[in-house]
A protein has these predicted regions:
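Inter-helical turn/loop segments and adjacent helix faces that build the functional surface
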Residues: 401, 474-489, 508, 553-565
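N-terminal export signals
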Residues: 3, 9-31
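Acidic/His metal-coordination segments adjacent to aromatic residues that form catalytic metal sites
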Residues: 371-382, 444-460, 524-539, 682-695
Length: 794
């Protein structure tokens, strides 16, 4: 990402699979085929034991993006304010996008990048729940929580001796947002519910069904709707104009449904013309309002916990005084007292990243720059899908954190977009206006631009190596799972990307520092994200990621028994690729084929390190010592200060270098409180960074920093699992983490004391052999699929 939205302003001024593939991974917004199964014996984690973020006051609506608590089911999401008198939900649907296929180039060779051509993610509506008499002056003992253990937002408070409680969540099985108001001690709820449009939609009330609704259609043809209903068997609920009113309700159940006619099928224009969103939303809201509130809650919690409980995190004990602090104060105290570790806070931060993944990526579109959570209809960079770090960083966490079921959203998105990406590549990539066009004149396969939308559209400049970086993410999921069916599904993406590079690479004569020369293959004119220059040959970023792409294609073809001749061609190309050198002048790994110290030394991107992390073909075992030292030198020059996502990437790289102190310090930099719009973590734990007089929310650091934490605890690549490679001193006394994913098809439970591994449980989820390491200890192990092995390194 750029360091400010000025790029968007500038752009405003400057102005292989078969079509029709239906995707199993994305649920369209249609009538549910059967009743949802209601689980029995569900046990919520008690508040006193739950991992939670908590606050002594409601969110201020003017700061909802920094203070509102997020809920989501992968498609529907909301930011929740939890004001007893005036609660508000900023509601979103992941498929609600303006914009088009955007398949034209401007005179400067860029794709248009505005809200009407490229498009933007936006709000579906606001839902407001106003309760009479529950004003700030009347309320006591207020507390709101984001309950990470159970997957819901709660608010509790007292009014005139009665104790009130509010639960808000987005259910994945029932596909609705639920707000449930309860009380103990003789209290009642009276007030009104409003559905507030964020554009020019009109809200209508329907007395016969006791619903309020809105519907509209964008210029791109996307139809959408939202419906709210409420039920109480202890009071009165009615429609008054375009509002719902409720009177003397001891308990009140509010159900919100909404959706669009988006369909992940390029052949059908990404629209399901047979669906009427308003009808589906109304029917669903009414059906769910007939279900008991406890049953809805139990169904949601059982589903959520089936993912959340895949990993437990214990990094050590915090003090009682730390636990007594609300979450925002706790962030501040940790920052101002760097010598006083708060391991439970850091464990909660990791679990918050997992919560965002569970709630943001479930058989849906993948997580964009802001996930499901917005506060207006003008998100920075349109909350798009950026292909030069952001969407990839969003998915680093999944398999490492026991959330492999959340990953397919990314793969299915790429598959759904592939027909359009291929078509636009064939038609527009070698256009004379594209400064990155192939000088070979050849074109094949597919690639992307730096920005992508949900409708097959591309934005900003072409990004030649964006295809390879997406494939790296897709391949990494395979390395964790060894799922052959998944590999077969993504194979067209791998092959098409490799075909693109087979057509693009050019041959040059390169002179090495010792005076020797060699004919090598290099990337044509390109741009090292987002550093420049725009017309460089053989940028390290592309050379490394294409080398990995070619390896992936060969392994996939061999596994699936396909394309033997093409795989052999790719192997030949891979062997002739130029690979980055360490500069004899600076000692750094070069970003370009140039030994001088050029560029912005503290640039936010680590593009030349993509082969070190998230890639792994540069590593301690196979890379020359000089290369590892060149990586270290480059990281030192890049520094320890940047935006959240950039610090997260740095942290993961330092963990790979086994430098626990610097990896941990960068984590603390990400977690510093964002005060006065500075870079850091906001009250609701969203990552923010400064832009002028405001702070921008960008979600990638919320996944990248937890990934770095897990990299401190476990490093893996196929054939190697290393325990505690970079354990910070703050966590060293004692800890235990269960469910860490390891490449090669394994899961690991890890326990330690005084900085040493006390036990490790290794489970095969598809792998059969690997080497285990802990310090100087080594052990080669073989397991059957499903088998478990416990080791105690000595």
């Amino acid at each position: 990402m750029s360091d400010s939205p000025s790029r968007r302003d500038f752009l405003r001024i400057t102005g292989a699979v078969g079509a029709g593939m239906m995707l199993s991974g994305v649920r369209p917004f249609i009538a549910q085929a059967e009743e949802v199964a209601r689980p029995q014996g569900v046990s919520l984690v008690p508040e006193s034991e739950a991992t939670s973020l908590w606050y002594p006051a409601p969110a201020e609506e003017s700061r909802i993006i920094q203070q509102g608590l997020p809920i989501g089911n992968g498609r529907l999401g909301a930011l929740v304010g939890s004001d007893p008198a005036d609660d508000v939900l900023y509601l979103t649907d992941a498929t609600l996008w303006t914009g088009h296929r955007n398949d034209v180039l401007q005179d400067d060779g860029q794709f248009p990048y505005g809200p009407n051509d490229f498009g933007s993610f936006g709000l579906l509506a606001k839902v407001r729940v106003q309760v009479t008499g529950h004003t700030k002056a009347a309320v006591g003992d207020y507390r709101r929580r984001l309950d990470l253990s159970n997957g819901l937002v709660t608010a509790s408070y007292r009014v005139k001796g009665a104790q009130y409680r509010r639960e808000t969540y987005a259910s994945h099985p029932d596909d609705v947002v639920v707000v449930r108001l309860t009380q103990r001690g003789g209290g009642v709820h009276s007030g009104r519910i409003r559905l507030e449009p964020t554009r020019t939609e009109t809200v209508a009330g329907e007395a016969g069904t006791r619903t309020i609704s809105l519907q509209a259609r964008f210029d791109n043809g996307l139809r959408y709707a939202a419906v709210v209903t409420a039920f109480s068997d202890t009071g009165t609920v009615a429609v008054s104009g375009n509002e719902l009113t409720f009177t003397d309700c001891r308990e009140l159940l509010i159900v919100v449904s909404g959706g669009t006619d988006y369909l992940p099928d390029a052949a059908k224009g990404f629209r399901n013309t047979t669906v009427e969103p308003l009808t589906v939303a109304r029917d669903r809201a009414l059906a769910k309002a007939k279900v008991a509130g406890t049953a809805l809650l139990n169904t949601h919690v059982a589903d959520y916990q089936s993912l959340y409980r895949k990993m437990t995190v214990d990094l050590g004990e915090s003090s009682r005084s730390q636990r007594n602090l609300d979450s925002w104060s706790r962030l501040a105290v940790r920052h101002t007292n760097p010598g006083q570790p708060d391991p439970e806070l850091e464990a909660s931060y990791l679990q918050f990243g997992r919560y965002l993944m569970i709630t943001g990526s479930r058989d849906s579109l993948p997580i964009n720059l802001q996930g499901l959570w917005l506060h207006n209809n003008s998100p920075d960079w349109y909350a798009d899908y950026h292909t030069d770090i952001n969407i990839q960083m969003n998915y680093w966490l999944t398999d490492r954190a026991g959330l492999g079921r959340c990953f397919p959203a990314l793969a299915e998105y790429c598959l759904a977009q592939l027909p359009e990406w291929s078509r636009q590549t064939q038609r527009l990539y070698n256009d004379p206006r594209n400064r990155f066009r192939n000088s070979t004149g050849k074109i094949a396969g597919w690639t992307v631009a730096f920005s992508t939308n949900t409708n097959g559209g591309l934005g900003w400049w072409w990004h030649p190596a964006g295809n390879a970086w997406l494939c790296q993410s897709l391949w990494e999921h395979y390395e964790f799972t060894l799922d052959a069916k998944y590999l077969e599904r993504i194979y067209p993406l791998l092959k098409g990307a490799a075909e693109f590079w087979a057509a693009r690479l050019i041959t040059i004569t390169h002179t090495y520092p010792d005076g020797s020369t060699r004919q090598v293959l290099v990337d044509d004119k390109d741009w090292s994200p987002e550093h420049g220059p725009q017309d460089a040959l053989g940028i390290s970023y592309a050379q490394e990621i294409v080398w990995e792409l070619f390896r992936e294609l060969q392994l996939a073809a061999a596994k699936l028994g396909r394309d033997k001749e093409f795989a052999a061609q790719v192997k030949d190309l891979q062997e002739r690729l130029y690979l980055p050198e360490v500069s004899p002048k600076t000692g750094m790994l070069q970003e370009w084929m140039h030994p001088d110290d050029i560029g912005e030394r503290t640039h936010r991107h680590l593009s030349p390190l993509i082969g070190f992390f998230p890639g792994d073909h540069m590593n301690h075992d196979v890379s020359p010592k000089a290369t590892i030292e060149g990586i270290r030198k480059l990281l030192e020059v890049r520094g320890m200060e940047s935006f959240g996502w950039a610090c997260a990437w740095r942290s993961a790289c330092w963990a790979r270098l086994r430098d626990a102190d610097r990896a941990y310090q960068l984590l603390l930099t990400v977690m510093r409180p964002s005060i006065a719009n500075e870079n850091g973590t906001s009250a609701n734990f969203f990552d923010m960074y400064r832009n002028g007089d405001r702070a921008i929310f960008q979600i990638d650091a919320n996944f990248g920093a937890p990934t770095a934490m897990l990299e401190m605890l476990l490093y893996s690549r196929p054939g190697v699992i290393e325990f505690l490679p970079a354990l910070p001193g703050a966590w060293a006394k004692q800890g235990r983490v269960t469910g860490i994913g390891a490449k090669g098809g394994f899961e690991v439970d890890l326990a330690w004391r005084n900085g040493k591994v006390t036990s490790a449980v290794v489970r095969s989820v598809g792998g059969t052999s690997t080497e285990l390491r802990a310090g100087g200890w080594r052990r080669q192990v073989s397991l059957r699929v499903g088998e478990t092995l416990t080791v105690r390194p000595t």
